[in-house]
Design a protein with these regions (language model features):
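Conserved beta-strand segments of the P-loop GTPase G domain that flank and frequently precede/overlap
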Residues: 20-22, 52-54, 76
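Conserved catalytic cores of phosphodiester-cleaving nucleases, focusing on short active-site segments
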Residues: 7-9, 13-26
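Active-site-adjacent loop/helix micro-motif of nuclease/hydrolase catalytic cores
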Residues: 25-36
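Nucleic-acid nuclease catalytic cores
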Residues: 43-71
């Protein structure tokens, strides 16, 4: 976390992946996440992966449209007060 980004992965001083975490998959949360990911990626000169972290699965047509903008979903659930992420290793 750098004050703006929820979470990011860097290598040799360059941000490689940006994660935007949401506690809901509501329309408002999606608007917010898309805007944040796109705006935060603007000053990054290298290719950066954009990951939207959500608790509920999106409809496939929404996933497809997000992919057109380079945004990939990552889903999670809570088990015994711990987050469990589905497919995280495929995104790293």
């Amino acid at each position: 976390n750098n004050g703006n980004l929820d979470l990011f992965i860097h290598h040799k001083g360059r941000i490689k992946t940006i994660f935007e975490l949401k506690t809901s998959s509501s329309t408002q949360s999606l608007y917010s996440a898309v805007g944040q990911l796109l705006i935060y990626s603007i000053p990054i000169k290298n290719k950066v992966d954009l990951i939207m972290v959500l608790p509920e699965k999106l409809k496939s047509n929404v996933e497809t449209r997000l992919a057109e903008y380079g945004i990939k979903p990552l889903y999670y659930s809570w088990e015994s007060r711990e987050p469990v992420f589905f497919g995280l290793s495929k995104l790293l």
